[in-house]
Amino acid sequence: GYAVAYETAASAFDAFECAKFQRGSADGEAAAQRVEQYLGCDLMILDDLGTEMITAYSTSALYTLINTRLTRAKATIISTNCSNEELQKKYTPQILSRIEGEYQTLPFVGRDIRQIKKEREA
């Protein structure tokens, strides 16, 4: 079988931060294990990129995640509701270069399924 990890961007970057700053604690060790899973699994699904609070640390964590997985030739799916222009405002040129150069963009069109469900329930 294949090892797959799914995480929202915000939660993944929180795990990176916890692993670094709470090293030695039970929470820090659990976070470090999650980070290793994100870096080493066969397929990582990073959901909702761009919804996290953008900090120097979250940007560093994103770079580490993307670059490490590319170096290890591991598959990664990144979902976002951000346009390319929004991503350019949020992230560094190094991150954007990797995303634009190494990933295939698959735009989704149509209405938001959550809005459709809400309308049906009303």
State where each predicted segment sits.
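Loop/turn-to-beta-strand initiation segments
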Residues: 2-3, 40-44, 72-78
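Short glycine-rich substrate-engagement loop in P-loop NTPases that contacts/grips substrate
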Residues: 2-40, 56
